Amino acid sequence: MPRFDIVGQLGSLRRYARSLTRDSADAEDLVHDALVRAYERRGTFRSGGNLRAWLLSIVHNAFIDKMRSRRSEAARVEQAGYLTDASTPAPQEHSVRLAQVREAFFSLPEEQRSALHLVAIEGLSYQEAADASGVPLGTLMSRIGRARAALRGMESAAPAPAKNHLRIVGDPS
C-alpha cells in the first residue's frame, strides 16, 4: 500500500472545492467528504499514478453526487445568493479588478468553471483534467474554450474606465 502525501494536496483540493461550491464552508465539507472517500477507496489508487489528479477527481465526483442529491434548482439558486461579499473591497484598482475577475469566473456555468479551474488554476494537463472530470478530452477542451470566450465577452462588455474630466486651473509653472 503506497503512502499518500494528502497534506501536500490540501491546498489544491480546497481551491478546487471552493471553485465548485462558491462557498468556503461548503468547500471544506466537500474536501472532508472527498478525503473520507479517498481513504475508503485507497486500494483503487494505482501505484505511480498522479495522486493530485486522483484526489481532484474524487472531489469532482463528490461534488456531482452532492448536486444530484439536492432537492430542487431553487435550493441551488438560493445558495448562490450567498456569494456576495458583505465587506467592501479596498479602493485600489487592482482589488477592484480582482473582484471583477472573480465575479466573472463565478458567473460561468459549473461545467465551464470546473474545467477552467482544473487547467488554469490547478495546472493539470487537458488530459488529466478530462480524467478528473470524467469527460472526454474534446468535451473538456470545448468547455474551456467556451469559458474563455465568455470571459473575453464579459471583458469587452465591461464599462471603460472613467476619464478624468477635470481641468487644471492656474499657472502651470
Q: Which positions does each model-derived feature cover?
A:
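Σ70-family region 2.3-2.4 aromatic/basic alpha-helix that recognizes the −10 promoter
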Residues: 35-39, 49-69, 144, 148
